Amino acid sequence: MMEKLKSEQFPLSPSAEGCASPPRGDGDARGKQEGTTAETGEHRLPEELNGVAKETAHHATELKKEVAVIELSRRGGSADIKGRELKAELSHKVQTTELCRPPIPLPLPPRDPLSDTRMVQLSPPAFPLPARAMLYSNMTTPLATINSGFAGDAEQYGMYPSNRVKRRPAPYEVEINDGSQPKIVRRIFTNSRERWRQQNVNGAFAELRKLIPTHPPDKKLSKNEILRLAMKYINFLAKLLNDQDDMVGGEAPARANRDSRDATLVRDDLLQEMLSPNSSCGSLLDGDASPESFTEDQDSSVESRPSARGLHHSSLPLDGNAQR
């Protein structure tokens, strides 16, 4: 009866043995120990088979769980989050690159028409011609009008000062063979002529300075002082020549008295001119020996000689008359 019950229990609960029947079957077989080894072998075979089946079933469920986890992770896990982040970054990058790109057709800034008006207008104007003339007529002048001979009239109405337009030309501008630039060539010729004239004037003053006697021979004199001293020196030489002619001709004593009076008047005039505050040579009196004092000494010495000689000559006829 027990064997039948056991044989009936095993086929009836093959799945139940996977949950809780194997420990109870093992307890019955170990407690009673009634049956042959074949029966025990038959009893253990289903357990082993069931054990293997249990293990395989356990592994299968684990595989199913792992596959399900992988599938979940692939479908809605971190991969989906990363994919969404990548899509968001890509969309963000596309937006930034589109924003960073310059606008394709934008109107030119207001400074470009200024440069267009300066250069020769090869492109059509953006505004109608009257409006463009009203906007930029008082600001700049085109290059054609500047290079033409009528540029002087256009400079009066420009916003820029005349010193920017009237620049000093470079030497290479003379080589430009253009009929619209006679003004530049004329300006260069005028500058060279003025420079040559100034050099000639300076050379003439240097030569005149060498002829004027001064106490320090290398004394520095201005152009005004050189001219004043040259005039005085010329007057002194002219008087000296006149006195020599009078001495050779033997004129009357009245002429000698007149010459002496003239000499004293000239000396007084020279002193007043030197002492006047407007004279540029008055500052030279502070020195030890000024050129004017030197020339005045010469004038006084030379003028005193003819006066003395005239007096001596005048005394001779008086003596002759007395003897007669």
Swiss-Prot record:
One of its GO terms (biological process) is endocardium morphogenesis. Expressed in hemopoietic and endothelial lineages. Isoform beta emerges first, expressing in the entire anterior and posterior lateral mesoderm (ALM and PLM respectively), and in the ventral wall of the dorsal aorta, where definitive hemopoiesis begins. Isoform alpha expresses later as two pairs of stripes in the PLM and ALM, and becomes restricted to the intermediate cell mass (ICM) by the 18-somite stage. The ICM is the key site of primitive hemopoiesis, giving rise to the erythroid lineage. It comes from Danio rerio (Zebrafish). Residues 185-237 form the bHLH domain. SUPFAM superfamilies: HLH, helix-loop-helix DNA-binding domain. Residues 1-49, 276-324 are annotated as: Disordered. One of its GO terms (cellular component) is nucleus. Its main location: nucleus. Keywords: Angiogenesis, Developmental protein, Differentiation, DNA-binding, Nucleus, Transcription, Transcription regulation. It comes from the Eukaryota. It is found in: Nucleus. Transcription factor that plays a pivotal role in hemopoietic and endothelial development, acting synergistically with lmo2 and downstream of clo. Specifies mesodermal precursors to a hemangioblast cell fate. Hemangioblasts are bipotential precursors of blood and endothelium, and in the absence of hemopoietic induction cues such as gata1, tal1/scl-lmo2-induced hemangioblasts differentiate into endothelial cells. GO terms for molecular function: DNA binding; DNA-binding transcription factor activity, RNA polymerase II-specific; protein dimerization activity; RNA polymerase II cis-regulatory region sequence-specific DNA binding; sequence-specific DNA binding. This is T-cell acute lymphocytic leukemia protein 1 homolog.
